[in-house]
């Protein structure tokens, strides 16, 4: 839709944006990561001004950092930017040229998420446990990913599962609730998993209890261990760690 609108409008550049308040995590991310966020002032569909790291409250036209433009124009701007020592496309190339270039806005109204820290990663993933968000994000278009042929997930007698998204190759003997499990996760008998995101080949051993945990690949939570974060501060376990 954005590409079609860009062609039909004759714009030099079309920028996708959403109407929403600036997310709190985005406001504070610059001090930690030098990440810049952008908002637009609109005159009809034309972007008349681009603001960098705006502190305005209320609903804004927030950039999605998605732009459609002709290949040759992009090449020309990159060459000029290289000579001038520019570093940021939006700040150094587009923002100074809102009068020179025809920069049009495209409002995106579907599901979108801005992930810039562990908290937002956890929150946005957990939202996918709601059918309306999942259906909006995966709306029939194919998803291309790495192929790993595996067995269907097995739920052993006595296991319990409630409101979960589980990939193939998992073995569930314990209890899982409000959680997302990547491929090959194993939850042993007597283990309890709640409000967690467990990445590929994580192993939760017998009797372990975890809550509000994000585990990277190949993590093992040892037998009988308890590990609990909170919804505002999920615990992260790095790749290959044994807890």
Q: What do these predicted ranges mean?
A:
Residues 72, 80-243:
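Left-handed beta-helix
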Residues 1-125, 237:
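Unchanged
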């Amino acid at each position: 839709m954005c590409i079609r609108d860009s062609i039909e409008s004759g714009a030099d550049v079309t920028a996708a944006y959403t109407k929403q308040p600036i997310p709190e995590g985005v406001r504070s991310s610059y001090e930690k990561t030098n990440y810049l966020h952008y908002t637009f002032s609109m005159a009809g569909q034309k972007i008349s001004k681009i603001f960098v790291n705006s502190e305005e409250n209320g609903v804004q036209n927030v950039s999605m950092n998605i732009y459609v433009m002709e290949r040759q124009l992009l090449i020309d701007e990159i060459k000029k930017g290289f000579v001038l020592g520019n570093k940021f496309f939006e700040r150094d190339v587009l923002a100074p040229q809102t009068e020179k270039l025809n920069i049009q806005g495209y409002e995106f109204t579907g599901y979108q998420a801005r992930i810039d820290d562990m908290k937002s990663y956890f929150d946005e993933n957990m939202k996918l446990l709601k059918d309306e968000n999942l259906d909006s994000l995966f709306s029939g278009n194919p998803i291309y990913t790495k192929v790993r042929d595996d067995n269907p997930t097995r739920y052993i007698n006595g296991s319990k599962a409630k409101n979960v998204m589980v990939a193939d190759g998992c073995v569930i003997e314990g209890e899982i609730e409000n959680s997302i499990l990547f491929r090959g996760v194993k939850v042993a008998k007597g283990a309890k998993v709640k409000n967690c995101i467990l990445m590929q080949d994580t192993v939760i051993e017998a009797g372990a209890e975890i809550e509000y945990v994000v585990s990277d690949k190949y993590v093992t939570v040892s037998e009988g261990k308890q590990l609990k974060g909170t919804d505002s501060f999920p615990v992260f376990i790095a790749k290959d760690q044994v807890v």
